[in-house]
Design a protein with these regions (language model features):
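N-terminal membrane-targeting hydrophobic helices
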Residues: 1-195
């Protein structure tokens, strides 16, 4: 399935199950479901998402190193302040989440980021550090994997085991993908109208 299909379908699933009752919850739900719906394809070497995450990881670590350097040199106490605040877990969580994504990006496509292990590690990190977004993120990831099971290329759900699973009913750019996308757009529109 294409990225656009995963993006829309993940939101249909998350909004249908969570049914947020205000704009803030709607935005949080849709954002987390969108990230969950496309994070599994970070391992596609040619994708723009792969390049964007490479850049984000590089910038994040560069800023962290620069921040630490200036914190020590000028004695700002920034890292002590973060360590003593409630945001400490959030910073650690971002670190761990990006590290897991970075690891997954460098694995073969449809392996780690399409596995139960990948789902558990990414969702577990969010549950522990950002517990507001873990459930829509999980629904987004599960919806991605659900759609990809119908593809001809197998998913390594039990990664690191080599065995893959696939129903072999469609391929990447098939009419099935187009129909799932169109039906998902209609459902998303209806859900947003009802909410």
């Amino acid at each position: 399935m294409r990225c656009r299909t995963h993006l829309v379908f993940s939101n249909v699933v998350a909004l249908g199950l969570i049914q947020p009752n205000n704009v803030k919850d709607l935005v949080v739900c849709m954002t987390a479901a969108t990230v969950g719906g496309i994070v599994s394809d970070l391992d596609i070497r040619t994708s723009d998402k792969h390049k964007a995450v490479d850049l984000m990881v590089f910038l994040f670590f560069s800023l962290l190193v620069l921040g630490y350097y200036f914190d020590i040199k000028y004695n700002y106490g920034l890292f002590n302040m973060i360590g003593n605040s409630k945001y400490y877990l959030n910073v650690i969580g971002m670190f761990v989440f990006l590290g897991i994504c970075f690891y997954g990006m460098h694995q073969p496509h449809r392996s780690f980021l399409h596995s139960f292990l990948g789902i558990f590690l990414l969702t577990g990190t969010l549950y522990y550090c950002f517990n507001v977004i873990w459930f829509p993120f999980l629904l987004g990831m599960l919806s991605h994997i659900f759609l990809d099971i119908f593809n001809k290329r197998p998913l390594r759900l039990l990664y690191p085991l080599k065995y893959g699973f696939s129903l072999k009913l469609c391929n990447y750019n098939s009419p099935v993908d187009t129909w799932v996308f169109i039906i998902s757009i209609i459902c998303l529109g209806l859900e947003l109208y009802i909410l």
